């Protein structure tokens, strides 16, 4: 029987930052589509990661593991991928979702106060780390049909205020790398490389950024500047990732898909 194009049966995935928020929603949704094996990463909360895997198992996940991984580890790519391959007892990674990101409000500063160490930390975590993971995954992609999906941000398309400026630049760098990877490796690897450009979404990161502004600012911003007049939910993003992960998205490559409910500030940047 031919497998339905939306099905992820018999496929294996890595989802970074899968213990909570968008990453958790992505992990759960992929298993709703039949994903067989899954590795998720966490930074400190193993219990949250195991909770995600428990939900995934309810959806029929055959094998799932949680891997502690730090985006600031210069060897994150090799270490993570080797642990995933061994733990899932597989030679192949069909789907890679780079969702984990870094933004520390205690270090956020205006451009006049920006220091090289802070700049390097944000760029390493949000640009180098996902590229390192992709590089380590490439030899283990399937002969055809591999999927690499990077979670980006509407901040990559905007002129951002000082505290978010470096974060936005790091995500713009990730977008650029993704387009280049699609151009460079789509033929050789028969894989797709795409980003999902996420607007205001209710996650821990959303609340972290919210601390940089007056109380309620982020919620009111989303209502005022989003056509949907609400803040996004993690599942909204997971649905788009689920599409990109499947055969249905085989003709989408090098794209940055907007997932922002019609965020008006971003719309001119996409034209």
Curated annotation (Swiss-Prot):
EC number: 1.1.1.1
CDD domains, per database record: SDR_c
Keyword line: NADP, Oxidoreductase
One Pfam short name: adh_short_C2
Any Gene Ontology biological process: secondary metabolite biosynthetic process
Catalytic activity: a primary alcohol + NAD(+) = an aldehyde + NADH + H(+); a secondary alcohol + NAD(+) = a ketone + NADH + H(+)
Pathway: Secondary metabolite biosynthesis; Alkaloid biosynthesis; Mycotoxin biosynthesis
GO molecular function: alcohol dehydrogenase (NAD+) activity
Disulfide bond sites: none
EC class (word): oxidoreductase
Active site (UniProt): 152 (proton donor), 153 (proton donor), 167 (proton acceptor), 171 (lowers pka of active site tyr)
Residue positions binding NADP(+): 22, 70, 99, 167, 171, 203
Family of the protein in this entry: Belongs to the short-chain dehydrogenases/reductases (SDR) family.
The protein's role, per its UniProt record: Short chain dehydrogenase; part of the gene cluster that mediates the biosynthesis of the aspoquinolone mycotoxins. The role of asqE within the aspoquinolone pathway has still to be determined. The first step of the pathway is catalyzed by the nonribosomal peptide synthetase asqK that condenses anthranilic acid and O-methyl-L-tyrosine to produce 4'-methoxycyclopeptin. 4'-methoxycyclopeptin is then converted to 4'-methoxydehydrocyclopeptin by the ketoglutarate-dependent dioxygenase asqJ. AsqJ also converts its first product 4'-methoxydehydrocyclopeptin to 4'-methoxycyclopenin.
The protein's name in its UniProt record: Short chain dehydrogenase asqE
Organism, as annotated: Emericella nidulans (strain FGSC A4 / ATCC 38163 / CBS 112.46 / NRRL 194 / M139) (Aspergillus nidulans)
